[in-house]
Amino acid sequence: GFVFVCLSDSSPALPDYLGEVSAELNACGMADLRFYRRMVYDLDCNWKVFVDNYLDGGYHVPILHKGLSNAIDYRGYKSRFGERHATQYCEMSNDNESEETRRGSMANYIWLYPNMMFNFYDDILDTNLVIPVSENRCKVVFDFYFTEGQFDDEFKEQSITMSDRIQAEDEMICLSVQKGLQSRAYEVGRLSPEKE
């Protein structure tokens, strides 16, 4: 399980804060998952740049993540938004190569405000915790979980290798965005009149 800590007396109780995320996490079979490994990435970008990249609705997946793009059916990519979370989901493809690292029928990506992500591929989960370090740096902690008894170590290692490759691709784009934000040419744009 997970431990959530709040240092404020005025915050809502955890079930109220999680809202429908609780049901979504339970539906993904978290009770059967077992921790396997942790990887930590230090990124030279603001933590919100990483979160924004995660929440773009899969827009960058077919362009930037060829391996992941083969594993999921991007044409059916959908997003749902709640008060303190966003869920992105799509069906997995039947690509033989992707079966070496991802299995199942659905990919579910759940973001919990402000800095926690849950990435489910049926019997596989990786969590991402984004930790601000400074204005232009963050740390991202990846924890990998697999359903007990379902996968051998070779499959787990291949799955983590694919995740590491995806992270390297995301890091490249996040660093480019951060560089653009620091450019003299950058001007803050308008907020969305419809959403903000």
Give a label for each model feature:
Residues 2-196:
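C-terminal catalytic domain of Rieske-type non-heme iron oxygenases
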